[in-house]
């Protein structure tokens, strides 16, 4: 039969509806405030901050270990109000070592057991209202105990060592269920022996998809068929608390970082924690953001890594090709500038040499290049005219010498 959070039930199996929205199912949507209003409580409508907090509800608690209490077999299928209050107290918190369904009402931890607050979303008002409802129920239960009413008479005794015999009459279904629980409890390991650490420090994970919602909440719901009881026994046999403890000590870096951030967010002054005796190995943190990382095999991962490296190299080449072109252009421009500077220096030196050869501008260090060229042209033309004049004088002198030589020979002949 599907569980409904909006309709109150007198059966103790559905009494955990009072603790919603701290628990939720995968198939149904629970509305804690609507259920509280239908029950006629004094809770006020939720504030906008509470609506935001409700979107990030706390995780479902793992199921409890099979109970070793058998005195419930003698009671009816519908327990009294005291048993219902005890179930609520068992869900809200208690001592992890205590294996029975009933905690001591006079214990201080029993009265102060409330749900841990989520410090990120400041959802303290909903928890305060829940604590108020539970406190009223506990006060009613203690008053009934003092008056010596039937609630005190329905208090169960200490748990027996062996499984109870199945009773006859209207309590046959409860007896059969407790008998199945006793058989399952014989195969279970006491978590308090090998796992003495509080379970609230580790973020719970999701149960298998086919798990019963009542099993997720840790409520002992009588199985409808024998196959359901066999499935519950198989789930109980799969529990390995030692392996979970070792895995808790050797966590991966991602889980440790996530849990470290959650521990920093938790207030250190709050001693109130939720403790459960049975831990489900197949758990998942739904409050954590969805992981986009996909696990690949080793060979495929190597191929992907090599492909990423090649892609990065090609991208680097594509990105560096414009830079290479720019660097080449800069080198060419730099080389051209150097050569042009050398040419100008050589031309300047030649102008200085030409200026030194021209008498008119030889002593003028600030003579312009155009003036040097003009004076050089004039100087060359003057030198050429002097050359022509000197050549003409030389020819004239040569002729004069020839004439004088001829005259000398004539004189010698005349004397002879």
UniProtKB/Swiss-Prot annotation:
Residues 331-383 form the bHLH domain. Keywords: DNA-binding, Host nucleus, Oncogene. Residues 390-411 are annotated as: Leucine-zipper. Residues 144-174, 203-267, 315-336 are annotated as: Disordered. Residues 228-240 have a biased composition (Acidic residues). GO terms for cellular component: host cell nucleus. SMART domains: HLH (SM00353). Residues 212-227, 245-259 have a biased composition (Low complexity). InterPro entries: bHLH_dom (IPR011598), HLH_DNA-bd_sf (IPR036638), Myc-LZ (IPR003327), Myc_transcription_factors (IPR050433), Tscrpt_reg_Myc (IPR002418), Tscrpt_reg_Myc_N (IPR012682). Residues 315-324 have a biased composition (Polar residues). It comes from the Viruses. Pfam families: HLH, Myc-LZ, Myc_N. GO terms for molecular function: DNA binding; DNA-binding transcription factor activity; protein dimerization activity. Residues 156-169 have a biased composition (Pro residues). Transforms avian and murine macrophages and fibroblasts as well as murine B-lymphoid cells. Efficient DNA binding requires dimerization with another bHLH protein. This is Viral myc transforming protein. It comes from Avian myelocytomatosis virus HBI. The lineage of its organism: Viruses, Riboviria, Pararnavirae, Artverviricota, Revtraviricetes.
